[in-house]
C-alpha cells in the first residue's frame, strides 16, 4: 500500500516525523521518492538554500572522529520563558533574537554523530556523469524565492528571519554569530592566509580527474558504513558561512591545519545531514531506479541477452587483432566481481594480463582503453611509467597533522576497472616509492585488499577492483589469468581502421545495450548443482592424472571462468557444456603460454 507520508523538507519537519521512523524508512525504500530531490553532484550551490533537502552520491573516502552535539536543548527568552529546540540535523544551534541557550538545563540531551568524507565516484566516466546529470531534477530559482546571488549569501544576510547562530558544540570551539561576521566588510576569510590548499582538502583519489567532496553527517548505524563503499545519501544541506574555519576565533588554536581540515569552507566542501542512505550495488546510472530515467530509456526495447553477448564479443574480437579467445577472456574480465571471501582468498576475482601485444602498434593500449571507457561506468587508465611509479601516491596514508586520510590512486570504488599499461615502460631505476607502488598493486591483485598506511601500522580494507594489465612481454605483476595475444598479421596492419570501425559501430542504442548487459551480468547470481559438483571433481581427478602440475589454483580458476562464461551467455546454473567450454579455453590458453619464450613461460600462469 502506498505511503501517504511525504519526505520532510526541513529538519524541524523531520523531527516531527521521528515518532514514526519506521514509516519514514519504508518511504525511503521507494526509489521514486528520490527522483525529485536535487543531486548535489550536479547542482550548483548558489541554486540551493541552506537546509534544502538534497542528495549526494559518491564513495566514502574517509571516516572522521565522532562528534558530540546538542541533540535537544533549552532556550531562555528575555521574558524568562523557556522552550525546547531540536538540534539534530543542524550544524549551528538555532535561537531567535533575544534568546540564550541554557547549557546547564537538565532537559538538554547530547547525541553522537559521525562525519563521512564522501567524494564523487573516482574514475566515473563521462557518459555516466552525463546520464546522471540528465536524470537530475532542474532547480527553479524562482521557486526558492530568491536570486542566485542572494542564495549564495543567505547565511550571511539572513537576518530577515530574526534568527541567529551560536555554538555548534561546546566541546569543540565557539563559532561567531552571523551579526559578528556581517560587521566585517571584507569577504569571509580574506584577512587570513589559507593553510591548506583546496586540492588537499577535497582529497581526490585521482588528481588528474578531480572529484567533488561532501562531508556527510550520519546519526545512526555507524558500524554499517565501510570505507570505499558506494553510497547515495539524502539529507539537509548545510552551507552556513560560519562553518568555515577562516571565520573562527583561532587565537588559542594549537593546530591550525587540523582545524581547517575539519572545517573547510562549506562553499568548497558542503555539509549534508543525512537521514536516508542507500548502498549502491554498482555505479551504472542506466540501471539505477532512484534516478528519474528519461522516457526514451524506459521505453526502449532491447534484443535478447544472447544477441547482445554475441555482438559485444564480436566488438572485442575486432579490437583484439581478431583474437576470439582473447575476446572471451576480456569479456569474462569485464563482468567479473568478488562474490565471496574466505580467510585465504577473494573468490571471483579475474585479474587479466593480455600480453604479447604487437610492438609496432603505436599507442594501442590507450586506444583500446578508449573503447572500454565507453562501455564501463567507472574505469581508470594508468601508464606504468617510471615517473608514475616513483612519484604517484598509490595507497591512502594518514596525515596526523590534519587528521585526514590522504587518498591514493588505488583508493577506488568497487567495480572501477583499473587498466595498467606496461607497454610504455622504459628502463630505469625504481625508487623507494616505486617499489612500494608495485607492492601495493601486487597486493591489490592477489588479495583484492587495499593497504592503508597509518604510519605506525597498516590496515587492509576490502576492495573489488578488476585489474587489466596490457603488456608486450609477460607482466611484472601477478595475475589470475595470463593470455598471450595471438595477433592476426592482417589485423595488426589494419588495427587503426579496426578501432575506428569499433567506434563507428558503437552507436548510442548499441552502447546502451552493452552498458546494461555488462552491469546486469556482473550482478547476476550463479549456482552449481550437486550433480555438476561431482562432475567437476571427477574431471579434476582426470586432469591431475594427465598433468601432475594441476593444483587447487587451477581448479579454482576453472570454476571462476566457467561461472563467467555461463553468466555471459545468460545462464544462472553451471551445465556440462559451459564447463567443457571453460576447460577447452584453459587448455588453449596454457598452450599459448608454453609457446612463449622459456623465461616468460616459467613464470606463474
UniProtKB/Swiss-Prot annotation:
Main location: nucleus
InterPro entries: MCM_complex-bd
Subcellular localization(s) per the UniProt record: Nucleus
GO cellular component: nucleus
Keywords per UniProt: Cell cycle, Cell division, DNA replication, Mitosis, Nucleus, Phosphoprotein
Modification sites for Phosphoserine: 147, 150
A GO molecular-function descriptor: chromatin binding
Top-level lineage group: Eukaryota
One GO BP annotation of this record: DNA-templated DNA replication
A Pfam family assignment: MCM_bind
Keyword Phosphoprotein among UniProt keywords: yes
Family according to the record: Belongs to the MCMBP family.
Subunit structure: Interacts with the MCM complex.
Function: Associated component of the MCM complex that acts as a regulator of DNA replication. Binds to the MCM complex during late S phase and may act by promoting the disassembly of the MCM complex from chromatin.
Protein name: Mini-chromosome maintenance complex-binding protein
Organism: Drosophila melanogaster (Fruit fly)
Amino acid at each position: 500500500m502506498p505511503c501517504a507520508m511525504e519526505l520532510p523538507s526541513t529538519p524541524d519537519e523531520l523531527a516531527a516525523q521521528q515518532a514514526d521512523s519506521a514509516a519514514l524508512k519504508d518511504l525511503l525504500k521507494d526509489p521514486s521518492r528520490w527522483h525529485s530531490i536535487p543531486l548535489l553532484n550536479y547542482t550548483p550551490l548558489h541554486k540551493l538554500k541552506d537546509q534544502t533537502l538534497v542528495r549526494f552520491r559518491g564513495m566514502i573516502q574517509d571516516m572522521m572522529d565522532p562528534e558530540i552535539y546538542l541533540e535537544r536543548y533549552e532556550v531562555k527568552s528575555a521574558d524568562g520563558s523557556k522552550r525546547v529546540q531540536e538540534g539534530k540535523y543542524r550544524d549551528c544551534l538555532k535561537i531567535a533574537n533575544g534568546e540564550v541557550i541554557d547549557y546547564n538545563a537538565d532537559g538538554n540531551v547530547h547525541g553522537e554523530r559521525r562525519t563521512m568524507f564522501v567524494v564523487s565516484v573516482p574514475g566515473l566516466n563521462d557518459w555516466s556523469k552525463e546520464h546522471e546529470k540528465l536524470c537530475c531534477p532542474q532547480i527553479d530559482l524562482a521557486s526558492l524565492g530568491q536570486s542566485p546571488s542572494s542564495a549564495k549569501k543567505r547565511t550571511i544576510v539572513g537576518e530577515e528571519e530574526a534568527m541567529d547562530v551560536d555554538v555548534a558544540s561546546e566541546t569543540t570551539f565557539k563559532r561567531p554569530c552571523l551579526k559578528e561576521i556581517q560587521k566585517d566588510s571584507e569577504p569571509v576569510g580574506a584577512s587570513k592566509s589559507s593553510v591548506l590548499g583546496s586540492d588537499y582538502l577535497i582529497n581526490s583519489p585521482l588528481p588528474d580527474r578531480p572529484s567533488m567532496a561532501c562531508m556527510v553527517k550520519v546519526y545512526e548505524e555507524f558500524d554499517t558504513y565501510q570505507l570505499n563503499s558506494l553510497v547515495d545519501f539524502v539529507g539537509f544541506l548545510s552551507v552556513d558561512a560560519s562553518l568555515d574555519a577562516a571565520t573562527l576565533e583561532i587565537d588559542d588554536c594549537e593546530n591550525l591545519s587540523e582545524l581547517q581540515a575539519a572545517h573547510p569552507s562549506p562553499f568548497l566542501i558542503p555539509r549534508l545531514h543525512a537521514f536516508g542512505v542507500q548502498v549502491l550495488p554498482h555505479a551504472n546510472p542506466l540501471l539505477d531506479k532512484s534516478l528519474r530515467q528519461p522516457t526514451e530509456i524506459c521505453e526502449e526495447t532491447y534484443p535478447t541477452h544472447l544477441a547482445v553477448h554475441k555482438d559485444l564479443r564480436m566488438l572485442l574480437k575486432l579490437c583484439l587483432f581478431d583474437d576470439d579467445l582473447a575476446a572471451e577472456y576480456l569479456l569474462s574480465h569485464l563482468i567479473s566481481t568478488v562474490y565471496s571471501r574466505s580467510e585465504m582468498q577473494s573468490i571471483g576475482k579475474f585479474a587479466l594480463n593480455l600480453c604479447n601485444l604487437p610492438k609496432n602498434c603505436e599507442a594501442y593500449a590507450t586506444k583500446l582503453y578508449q573503447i572500454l571507457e565507453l562501455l564501463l561506468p567507472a574505469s581508470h587508465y594508468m601508464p606504468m611509467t617510471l615517473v608514475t611509479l616513483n612519484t604517484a601516491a598509490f595507497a591512502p596514508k594518514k596525515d596526523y597533522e590534519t587528521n585526514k586520510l590522504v587518498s591514493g590512486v588505488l583508493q577506488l570504488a568497487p567495480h572501477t576497472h583499473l587498466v595498467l599499461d606496461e607497454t610504455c615502460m622504459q628502463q630505469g631505476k625504481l625508487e623507494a616509492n616505486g617499489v612500494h607502488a608495485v607492492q601495493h598493486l601486487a597486493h591489490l591483485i592477489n588479495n583484492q585488499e587495499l593497504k592503508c598506511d597509518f604510519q605506525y601500522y597498516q590496515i587492509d580494507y576490502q576492495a573489488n577492483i578488476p585489474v587489466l594489465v596490457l603488456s608486450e612481454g609477460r607482466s611484472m605483476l601477478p595475475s589470475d589469468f595470463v593470455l598471450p595475444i595471438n595477433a592476426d598479421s592482417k589485423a595488426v596492419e589494419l588495427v587503426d581502421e579496426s578501432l575506428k570501425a569499433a567506434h563507428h559501430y558503437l552507436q548510442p542504442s548499441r552502447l546502451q545495450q552493452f552498458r546494461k548487459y555488462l552491469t546486469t551480468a556482473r550482478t547476476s547470481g550463479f549456482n552449481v548443482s550437486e550433480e555438476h559438483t561431482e562432475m567437476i571433481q571427477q574431471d579434476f581427478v582426470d586432469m591431475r592424472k594427465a598433468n601432475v602440475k594441476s593444483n587447487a589454483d587451477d581448479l579454482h580458476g576453472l570454476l571462476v571462468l566457467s561461472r563467467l562464461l555461463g553468466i555471459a551467455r545468460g545462464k544462472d546454473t553451471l551445465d556440462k557444456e559451459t564447463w567443457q567450454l571453460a576447460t577447452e579455453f584453459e587448455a588453449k590458453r596454457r598452450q599459448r603460454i608454453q609457446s612463449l619464450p622459456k623465461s616468460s613461460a616459467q613464470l606463474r600462469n
